[in-house]
Each structure stands twice: as structure tokens, then as C-alpha cells.
From Swiss-Prot:
Gene: htpX
GO BP: proteolysis
One Gene Ontology term, aspect cellular component: plasma membrane
Family annotation (HAMAP family): Pept_M48_protease_HtpX (MF_00188)
Record EC number: 3.4.24.-
Binding site for Zn(2+): 135, 139, 210
Cofactor note: Binds 1 zinc ion per subunit.
GO MF annotation, one: metalloendopeptidase activity
Species whose genome carries this gene: Bifidobacterium longum (strain NCC 2705)
Location(s), subcellular: Cell membrane
The name this protein goes by in its record: Protease HtpX homolog
Length: 306
């Protein structure tokens, strides 16, 4: 099981982001007023997105809330899993796109929403859909929207501190007054590299939370193999029926169960999701540990049909 390691990794990544903030803050002169201003800016710029995350994400996807009569299977699964977790049932939405995907959003359990695309409902069977919904519910129960908001706020602070170092130099510390702070080259490196480093750490936190949702969701459903099979189908479906790239879909892509926009090579470092094959391998290992028997990973030949 990787849960405790993932939690430690998330904590260490946040600590690293804070260390970067402290380093750049020190380089800018260590003014508490400056740091306070940028922290407030970071909180303000992310608060709205966090507080209204459910409304913004749903609107971005053009999704609509559905009744139990319209989506009885989803309601049955979500009601069962919510009751099992001892949590209130979220609202259910369906997005009008044939690209298979799903996401959960909301600042807490009482303001949560789960959204499935029309495409995912067509390619997954009930067992696989249950695995996906378990994953999404755990994003809500693990407060991953809040985690993402904090990471985003810290990245914003780092960016502003970098720009401050670029435009205002190293402040008034005696040991830097005579040398012009870190110098132009140091300032340029800071303004360029600091936001990149912050973004890399932010994406690493996101990938860690995906692994946690995979594991915790599988513990909730008791069926990691179902989620592995679902991810396999979703990955294939995203290639054959790609999601249209718009400002709305891009803003929600980090919340989705699988990255709808392919990331290859160096760009994987900036991906919000771990590689699908690695997620599947972990899930199959988890299934093996739970069942006590080796289970072969799903192959591409299993991606069609229900």
C-alpha cells in the first residue's frame, strides 16, 4: 500500500514549496510586509476558484444535473458508496461530450458534485463505473480541491516574489546593498526558474493525489481491478474520441480521472496525472495483494465492449 508514502510525499512537496517561498523572500530583503501582501494576493486569487469550484467546473463542461430517473445506475452506485463512507451524497451531473471521462468537485462533502461524460457511460460496465465513481468520491473526501487550492496559492506567491526580485532587486540587506542584490543574472534566473519550480511541485502534488484517490477509492469499492480496467478503456477512448480543447475543458482537465490531453516526453513533468500504465500497474498490484492471487493487467483487447 502506498497511502502513507503518498501522504508523506505531499507534505514534503508542500514543505519544498514553502522553502522556495522563504528563499526568494530572503533574497528580496526579507520584508514581512512584502510577504504578507503576496500571501494575501495568492489567497484572494485562489479563494474564488476554490469556493465556487463546483459551479465553475460544471459550467465549464456545459454539464447538467440529472435526476435518479435519468441516471438510476449512477445514483445507485454513488448512494451505496457514500453511505459506506458515511458521507452525504453529492449531486450528479452529465456532461455532453463523447470523450470518456469523469470528475468530482466541490469545496466539501456538502457542496460536492460528481460529473460523468456521456462517453464514459457508453464504454464502461457497471463494475468499472463503480470503480471510477469510488475514485472521484475520494477526491472529495480527501479534500483534494482544498489541497489543490493551497498549492495554487503558494505557486502564486512564488511567482509574485520572483517578479518582485526581478523589478525591485534584493531589498535593503547590508550584505547585498553594495552588490546590487543577487545581480541581474540572479534576478532573471529567479523570475524564470522559481515559477517553473513551483509549477513542477504543484503538478507533482496533483499526481500524488491521483495515486491516493486510486488507492482509497479502490479500498472503498473493494475492487481495484475494476478501476484498472476502467482506466484502460478511458485511455483508449480518449485517443479515439479526443476531448475538444477549450478554455473550459482545459480548466477542468486537472480534476478529471484521466488527462484528456496527451502529455508525452518532457511535458509529463507538468502533467497533473501520473502515466496511466503506472496507475494500472499499482492497481493490479493492489488487487493481487487483496486477493492473494496474481492478476494479469488488462490489455488493449479488453477495451471494447461491456
Amino acid at each position: 500500500m502506498h497511502g502513507h508514502f503518498n501522504g508523506l510525499k505531499t507534505t514534503l512537496l508542500f514543505a519544498l514549496m514553502w522553502a522556495i517561498i522563504m528563499l526568494i523572500w530572503w533574497a528580496t530583503g526579507g520584508s514581512r510586509q512584502t510577504l504578507s501582501i503576496y500571501i494575501v494576493i495568492g489567497l484572494i486569487t485562489t479563494f474564488g476558484t476554490y469556493w465556487f469550484s463546483d459551479k465553475l467546473a460544471i459550467a465549464s463542461m456545459g454539464a447538467r444535473e440529472v435526476s435518479e430517473q435519468e441516471a438510476p445506475e449512477i445514483y445507485q452506485i454513488v448512494r451505496e458508496l457514500s453511505a459506506k463512507a458515511g458521507k452525504p451524497m453529492p449531486r450528479i451531473y452529465i456532461a455532453p461530450t463523447m470523450s470518456p471521462n469523469a470528475f468530482a468537485t466541490g469545496r466539501n462533502e456538502r457542496h460536492a458534485a460528481v460529473c460523468c461524460t456521456q462517453g464514459i457511460l457508453q464504454i464502461l460496465n457497471a463494475r468499472e463505473l463503480r470503480g471510477v465513481l469510488g475514485h472521484e468520491l475520494m477526491h472529495v473526501y480527501n479534500h483534494d480541491i482544498l489541497t489543490s487550492a493551497i498549492a495554487s496559492a503558494m505557486a502564486t506567491v512564488i511567482s509574485y516574489l520572483g517578479y518582485s526580485l526581478m523589478y525591485f532587486g534584493g531589498g535593503s540587506r547590508d550584505d547585498r546593498d553594495s552588490s546590487g542584490g543577487l545581480g541581474l543574472i540572479g534576478a532573471l534566473l529567479s523570475v524564470i526558474l522559481a515559477p517553473i519550480a513551483a509549477s513542477l511541485i504543484q503538478m507533482a502534488i496533483s499526481r500524488t493525489r491521483e495515486y491516493d484517490a486510486d488507492e482509497d477509492g479502490s479500498l472503498l469499492t473493494g475492487d481495484p481491478e475494476a478501476l484498472a480496467s476502467a482506466l484502460n478503456k478511458i485511455s483508449y477512448g480518449a485517443q479515439t474520441t479526443p476531448m475538444r480543447k477549450t478554455a473550459g475543458t482545459q480548466s477542468v482537465s486537472a480534476m478529471m480521472i484521466a488527462n484528456p490531453f496527451s502529455a508525452v516526453g518532457f511535458s509529463r513533468l507538468f502533467s497533473t496525472h501520473p502515466p496511466t500504465d503506472e496507475r494500472i500497474a499499482r492497481l493490479m498490484q493492489m488487487a493481487n495483494e487483496m486477493n492473494g492471487t496474481p492478476i494479469a493487467p488488462p490489455t488493449y483487447s479488453t477495451r471494447v465492449g461491456r
